[in-house]
């Protein structure tokens, strides 16, 4: 009798799962399916076909998928190859504290669609819990002064290295990365800056003094290890993160995921100074064959050619980790990172590391997250192409997440000796 097993049944989302099947007939072909519903009820699913060994077993750590949503030996392929049933939907975990993703794994006979319906009998099934928060992590709702967000603290007395987590142009408050970082020992502030609570409904300017308040708030907490803090940032959040690293002396480690090295669209304001956006070439905004907008060429005639538009990154005192998806269709991230590095090198600085991933897109998330290659965005019509190829993007997410943690611990905790 066929038996499906997975170890562990409950784990953090960035932890691998070992999936095996036993009790099959020799060389039997079976289908493995995975599905989950997000907090809004949107369905995501994947499937892969496997041939059993001569002893009737399938082991995803050893055996190659014959087809389906991926091919080859990929132990976590059922997770990162999931696709949304509703097109242009990004998998975002909103309730990180109380509910895990429940992933249904189903073992069944190979099936053939009949009149649009899937005809397949189940041989076995199980449910996995995938958490964004480890036991003992606490969440504190933050509404202090102008600051709005959520602070996640690891279990224990601390003090812990402090990190500010910044997302990009979607607005609102994203907590899933901060809660996961806290699960790995970082006191992490998920900081909203527009489209949340009583913050502005649209991002019209970047007030760096607001983010400075966020830094000071974090450093005041008794469980946060000073004297500096780190930044984990993506897209427009990375633009802000870079600006913070240059202007705020408390920033000692900055992770920039697919961000520009210049002011892209909204002016930055700090202590009376205004940093104006870089001119863009709207004629280079393109729409691909699927009707998705691509912005990555819009600064070809300005920032990509002339360093006068670039942030003076050489003035920063901290360290930088650039994470680049070379198939990013939203920003020319590889060019922007190389420009910033060239400025640092010209000033004789070696305070940078570059991770550049061929085939990875714009939205580089924690490990095993499904690739979101396109989605809807507030105030942007039509939808945006983020880029990325499924398998190399998944590899980039797994590798970069480990490197991000190493980098932050190295530069925020002087006594850290990498064991990752």
Swiss-Prot record:
Optimum pH is 7.8. It catalyses: choloyl-CoA + glycine = glycocholate + CoA + H(+); hexadecanoyl-CoA + H2O = hexadecanoate + CoA + H(+); choloyl-CoA + H2O = cholate + CoA + H(+); chenodeoxycholoyl-CoA + H2O = chenodeoxycholate + CoA + H(+). The modification N6-succinyllysine is found at residues 40, 346, 350, 409. Expressed in liver (at protein level); found in hepatocytes, sinusoidal endothelial cells and Kupffer cells. The keyword Phosphoprotein applies. Pfam families: BAAT_C, Bile_Hydr_Trans. Its EC number is 2.3.1.65, 3.1.2.27, 3.1.2.2. One of its GO terms (molecular function) is long-chain fatty acyl-CoA hydrolase activity. InterPro entries: AB_hydrolase_fold, Acyl-CoA_thioEstase_long-chain, BAAT_C, Thio_Ohase/aa_AcTrfase, Thio_Ohase/BAAT_N. The modification Phosphoserine is found at residues 125, 418. It is found in: Peroxisome; Cytoplasm, Cytosol. GO terms for biological process: acyl-CoA metabolic process; animal organ regeneration; bile acid biosynthetic process; bile acid conjugation; bile acid metabolic process; fatty acid metabolic process; glycine metabolic process; liver development. GO terms for cellular component: cytosol; peroxisome. The keyword Transferase applies. Catalyzes the amidation of bile acids (BAs) with the amino acids taurine and glycine. More efficient at taurine conjugation of cholyl CoA than glycine conjugation. Amidation of BAs in the liver with glycine or taurine prior to their excretion into bile is an important biochemical event in bile acid metabolism. This conjugation (or amidation) plays several important biological roles in that it promotes the secretion of BAs and cholesterol into bile and increases the detergent properties of BAs in the intestine, which facilitates lipid and vitamin absorption. Belongs to the C/M/P thioester hydrolase family. PANTHER family: ACYL-COENZYME A THIOESTERASE-RELATED, BILE ACID-COA:AMINO ACID N-ACYLTRANSFERASE. This is Bile acid-CoA:amino acid N-acyltransferase. It comes from Rattus norvegicus.
């Amino acid at each position: 009798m066929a038996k499906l097993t997975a170890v562990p049944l409950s784990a953090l989302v960035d932890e691998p799962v070992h999936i095996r099947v036993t009790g099959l007939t020799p060389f039997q072909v079976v289908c493995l399916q995975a599905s989950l519903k997000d907090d809004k009820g949107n369905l995501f699913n994947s499937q892969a076909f496997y041939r059993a060994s001569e002893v009737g077993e399938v082991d995803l750590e050893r055996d190659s998928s014959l087809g389906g949503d991926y091919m080859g030996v990929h132990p976590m392929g059922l997770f990162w190859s999931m696709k949304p049933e509703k097109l242009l939907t990004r998998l975002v975990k909103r309730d990180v504290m109380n509910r895990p993703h429940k992933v249904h794994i189903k073992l069944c006979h190979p099936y053939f669609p009949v009149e649009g319906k899937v005809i397949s009998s189940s041989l076995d099934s199980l449910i996995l819990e995938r958490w964004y928060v480890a036991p003992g992590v606490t969440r504190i709702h933050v509404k202090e002064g102008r600051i709005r967000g959520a602070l996640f603290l690891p279990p224990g007395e601390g003090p812990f290295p402090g990190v500010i987590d910044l997302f990009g142009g979607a607005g609102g408050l994203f907590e899933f990365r901060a809660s996961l970082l806290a699960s790995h020992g970082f006191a992490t502030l998920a900081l909203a800056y527009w489209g949340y609570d009583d913050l502005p409904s649209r991002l019209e300017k970047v007030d760096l003094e607001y983010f400075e308040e966020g830094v000071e708030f974090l450093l005041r907490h008794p469980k946060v290890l000073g004297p500096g803090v780190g930044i984990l940032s993506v897209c427009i959040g990375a633009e802000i993160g870079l600006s913070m690293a240059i202007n705020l002396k408390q920033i000692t480690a900055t992770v920039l995921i697919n961000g520009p090295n210049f002011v892209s669209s909204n002016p930055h304001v700090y202590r009376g100074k205004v940093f104006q956006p870089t001119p863009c070439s709207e004629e280079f905004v393109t729409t691909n064959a699927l009707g998705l907008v691509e912005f990555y060429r819009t600064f070809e005639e300005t920032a990509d050619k002339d360093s006068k538009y670039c942030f003076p990154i050489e003035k920063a005192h901290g360290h930088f980790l650039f994470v680049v998806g070379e198939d990013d269709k939203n920003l020319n991230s590889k060019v922007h990172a190389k420009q910033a590095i060239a400025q640092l090198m010209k000033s004789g600085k070696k305070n940078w590391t570059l991770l550049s991933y061929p085939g990875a897109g714009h939205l580089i998330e924690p490990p095993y997250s499904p690739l979101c290659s396109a989605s809807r965005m507030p105030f942007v019509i039509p939808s945006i192409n983020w880029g990325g190829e499924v398998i190399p993007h998944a590899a980039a997410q797994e590798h970069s997440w480990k490197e991000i943690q190493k980098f932050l611990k190295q530069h925020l905790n002087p006594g850290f000796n990498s064991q990752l």
